[in-house]
């Protein structure tokens, strides 16, 4: 395992290099890209990052395109909610 501390976490490997504010930004990205996400197809927390923007479920094998560091980008969430709202308006 690489170097880490309780406070620095995953960016402990960088030591004192690059500055505190940059390490905080990197920590946010690295924690989100290494975490598991919920699979919409099988309903399990098994989606992991395969490459930049490619997310795959370890359980059902489905592959989904998403953001570089998180599975869902902010703009994708906005578009999805807008489409759902418009669909509900046309049905009602």
Curated annotation (Swiss-Prot):
Annotated zinc fingers (C4-type), start-end: 39-60
Name of this protein: Large ribosomal subunit protein eL43z
Gene Ontology, cellular component aspect: plastid; ribonucleoprotein complex; ribosome
Keyword Zinc-finger in record: yes
UniProt xrefs under NCBIfam families: eL43_euk_arch, PRK03976.1
GO biological process: translation
Keyword Ribosomal protein appears in the UniProt entry: yes
GO function terms (MF aspect): structural constituent of ribosome; zinc ion binding
Pfam families noted in UniProt: Ribosomal_L37ae (PF01780)
Gene3D superfamilies: 2.20.25.30
């Amino acid at each position: 395992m690489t170097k880490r501390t309780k406070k620095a976490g995953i960016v402990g490997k960088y030591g004192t290099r690059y500055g505190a504010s940059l390490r905080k930004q990197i920590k946010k990205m690295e924690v989100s890209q290494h975490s598991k996400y919920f699979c919409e197809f099988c309903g399990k927390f098994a989606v992991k990052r395969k490459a930049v923007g490619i997310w795959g479920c370890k359980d059902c094998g489905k592959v989904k395109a998403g953001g570089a560091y998180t599975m869902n980008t902010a703009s994708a969430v906005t578009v999805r909610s807008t489409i759902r709202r418009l669909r509900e308006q046309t049905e009602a």
